[in-house]
Regions:
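FAD cofactor-binding and catalytic pocket of flavoenzymes
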Residues: 212, 385-509, 541, 549-554, ...
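Rossmann-like flavin
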Residues: 57-60, 65-69, 77-78, 90, ...
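A glycine-rich dinucleotide-binding beta-alpha-beta segment and adjacent secondary-structure elements
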Residues: 131, 280-281, 287-295, 328-341, ...
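N-terminal FAD cofactor-binding segment of flavoenzymes
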Residues: 155, 162-211, 218-222, 264-270
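Glycine-rich loop(s) and the adjacent beta-strand/alpha-helix scaffold that form part
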Residues: 149-175, 198, 204, 316, ...
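Extreme N-terminal leader/targeting segments of oxidoreductases
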Residues: 8-15, 61, 68-133, 193, ...
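N-terminal Rossmann-like FAD-binding beta1-loop-alpha1 element of flavoenzymes
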Residues: 131-159
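Helical element adjacent to the flavin cofactor pocket in flavoenzyme catalytic cores
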Residues: 293-363
Length: 615
């Protein structure tokens, strides 16, 4: 998959590419691991009667080219899986980084103002059972804000987090180690469908705010108005004070164009040539040193995730954080939620308590495990009715890369830096997004030596992410072994919108001076300005798109009992004292990075609980 070429080492001979990947796979669930093994085994056996690993280099490249040109969607899925895993371990090898000129520094800049990293107190469960007024499941944007709001109002709060706590003193040094430690299922959660879509989410103290790009958008006014009109969320138009308070506390500011890096500047220049509306992205990372390492945890905690913002506030007000505890069932007595039963110590070797751990909540139980974890817990508990886990939206996204004659060195910049909202009526948001080679290398064009040439060219690559506010839907369910199962069906209409967005991203690249564009659609290959019209005239099947998604939402949505899981106050239909406070509540796709909307919802819902207590 990665032969020697022009100074790049051969993966099989010169680089230990399998070791780091094996460590990553050790972090995934048995079900995910079995599916990965099945896919890679199928790839190995496809050249029947031979095996891929026993073919000559020339035969391998010929076979890979035929797979890439095939009309069979399953071939493209297996090929992409093989490329991703081959690149994961290879891309982080020092020999590869040195050859492509990759170097970055995440040291604090002079005069910077990093967020203090604690304290978060003793996070070990105090015995097999504890009591509190309110138990909060999850420590991400929803759970952390709810915990801070409730604790500062004088309530006794316990926050449960399945993952570990990290900060700038102890983030893993290597990217794959960080992915294994910080993400659920080692970042390999997949929404099954055609195409299958990776949906990586965090499992760590602070949730996905630890590994996201720090992008801060308010929910569009039109979306909030729709939620008020169609789903009865009367307060949806009253969130401006919540947004403003969060922006002030998190020190959210628009990115200085001088600091966004060349990748963002090229997107800005291309959009300006086209007259497309957009602007620098607002972020909660004033001390950012532009190292583009956001998905591995900020090594200097310049990004004000929940672990260095709202959670310390909650703990300072008396909340107790418990890590390494996986919530398994909401406890119900006489129609009232009374707490949560957990497995303690299963995911955190530093946790002193192992076995069953129970939290009894006198007043309320808040579930904020994200749009995957929240329905998973509700389903295990037999709660939420027929709608639990349904209505999954994910903002399917496509990486659109381009080659520039000039050096871009996108890793020396902010991961997400510039947005283009010109095509919002088409439900599209474009964001200049650059990820390190370990994350993005598998999406580069070509196979074999062609893919190696793309890796050599990585310093000349610019990239734009095309995000769709999807009408397509999926579902979270439980597999036969009790593990989470995600599925998603991309409609033809949404596939057409994504293809339109890819063409617009290509236009921006060409307007900024790119010589060729890589659209990440099966059998399309490389685009030039002359081929763009032909591309736009082509209709693509959903299965031909290569997508990722980072914003799951809607799986416990606010709607009537027949169409949703929760009422407008976040309470689960039919259960007293049980609330949801995360992106699961969103009735439809929010259309922008959801962190700030989650914060506003959590603040509103937890604030209402305080108001009810105060009478």
């Amino acid at each position: 998959m990665a032969p020697a070429l022009d100074g790049l080492p051969a993966a099989e001979r010169d680089v230990d590419a399998s070791g780091p990947v094996a460590e990553l796979l050790a972090a995934v669930s048995p079900r995910t691991l079995s599916r990965i093994k099945l896919g890679l085994r199928a790839f190995e056996l496809l050249p029947f009667p031979w095996r891929f690993s026993r073919l000559s280099l020339a035969a391998r490249e010929d076979f890979l080219r035929r797979m890439e040109g095939s009309r069979l969607g399953v071939y493209h899925e297996l090929l992409l899986m093989a490329k991703v895993f081959a690149t994961l371990g290879y891309a982080v090898a020092p020999e590869v980084e040195q050859r492509i000129g990759f170097e970055t520094s995440c040291r604090l800049a002079d005069g910077s103002d990093p967020q203090p990293s604690g304290p978060l107190g003793n996070t070990k469960p105090a015995g097999e059972e504890e009591e509190c007024d309110v138990v909060v499941v999850g420590s991400g944007a929803g759970g952390a804000v709810a915990a801070a709001t409730l604790a500062e109002a004088g309530l006794d709060v316990i926050v449960l987090e399945a993952g570990r706590s990290f900060n700038r003193e102890d983030y893993p040094d290597q990217p794959l180690d960080a992915i294994a430690a910080l993400y659920r299922d080692g970042g390999l959660t997949i929404a099954e469908g055609r195409p299958p879509i990776p949906v990586p989410v965090a499992r760590t103290v602070g949730g996905t705010t630890v590994v996201n790009s720090g992008t801060c958008f308010r929910a569009p006014a039109a979306v909030l108005a729709d939620w008020r009109r169609r789903f009865g969320i009367e307060w949806a138009g009253e969130l401006d004070p919540c947004f403003a308070e969060a922006e002030q506390f998190l020190r959210v500011t628009p990115l200085d164009p001088e600091r966004m890096g060349r990748n963002g500047q090229l997107a800005m220049e291309g959009a300006a040539v086209l007259g497309a509306s957009g602007g620098p992205i607002s972020r909660n990372a004033g001390s950012c040193v532009q190292c583009s390492s956001c998905p591995f945890g900020c090594e200097i905690d310049a990004k004000r995730g929940m672990h260095v913002s709202y959670l310390p506030r909650a703990v300072a007000a008396g909340a107790r954080l418990r890590t390494g505890v996986e919530a398994r069932r909401v406890l119900i007595e006489a129609g009232q939620a009374t707490g949560v039963r957990c497995i303690a110590g299963a995911l955190d070797s530093r946790n002193g308590c192992r076995g069953t751990y129970t939290v009894r909540a006198r007043q309320a139980t808040i579930v904020a495990g994200g749009a995957l974890g929240t329905p998973e817990l509700l389903l295990r508990s037999g709660l939420g009715g027929r709608q639990a886990g349904r209505n999954l939206h994910i903002h399917p996204a496509c990486w659109v890369g381009a080659r520039y004659d000039e050096e871009v060195r996108g890793w020396n910049g902010v991961m997400q830096s510039y947005y283009v909202d010109e095509w919002e009526p088409q439900r599209l948001l474009l964001e200049a997004t650059f990820t390190p080679l370990a994350f993005g290398g598998g999406w580069l064009q070509g196979t074999g030596r062609e893919h190696q040439r793309a890796i050599l060219d990585f310093g000349h690559i610019g990239s734009i992410g095309v995000h769709l506010s999807d009408e397509s839907q999926g579902r979270i369910g439980l597999a036969g072994d009790g593990s989470l199962r995600a599925s998603y069906k991309l409609t033809s209409e949404d596939a057409d919108r994504l293809a339109f967005g890819i063409a617009r991203a290509a236009e921006i690249h060409f307007a900024a001076g790119a010589t060729e564009v890589y659209p990440n659609i099966a059998r399309v290959g490389t685009l030039t300005p002359k081929r763009l019209a032909e591309f736009e005239a082509t209709s693509f099947k959903p299965s031909e798109l290569r997508l990722e998604a980072f914003h799951p939402m809607g799986t416990a949505r606010i709607a009537s009992e027949s169409e949703g899981v929760c009422g407008p106050d976040g309470s689960v239909h039919g259960v007293k004292g049980l609330h949801v406070a995360d992106a699961s509540l969103f009735p439809t796709s929010v259309g922008v990075n959801p962190m700030m909307t989650v914060i506003a919802f959590a603040q509103r819902i937890s604030g209402e609980l305080v108001r009810q207590r105060d009478g």
